[in-house]
Amino acid sequence: MTIAVGQEAPDFELPNQFGEKVSLSSFRGKKNVVVVFFPFAFTGTCTGELCALRDDLSVFQNDNVELLAISCDAMFTQKVFAEKEGYNFPLLSDFWPHGAVAQKYGVFNADRGLALRGTFVIDKSGIVRWTVVNSPAEARNLADYKTALASL
């Protein structure tokens, strides 16, 4: 079951594309967090969505907001993906145990071994304030993210 608005966001600690551990709780009391689960690196829709975030990064990564993009790809895949596309935000690897964080958020497709396109806007106190889950083939609308962030 997907984490709902008003619930506390499950904490996690995952390696970023450089092998550094990143935890959700490290932002508590400091920044709102946008957690973006994506199915696979190097695929058309995922690349398009993350490039749109990259191109409008000041909205999603600033003194008040942290952007964390998560897939079940290996850390080394995330590193090459970030380098190729010029992503200057954390790409976190939910590779092992495979999809454990995506499962906590209710966005893991066990049959396909991937994270669905789940987005969670989490406030500074760790509460989910907005969420949407799309199918793997359906791109998300970044304008919705901006509206959700503006309401915090």
Role assignments for model-derived ranges:
Residues 1-152:
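Chalcogenol-based redox active-site neighborhoods
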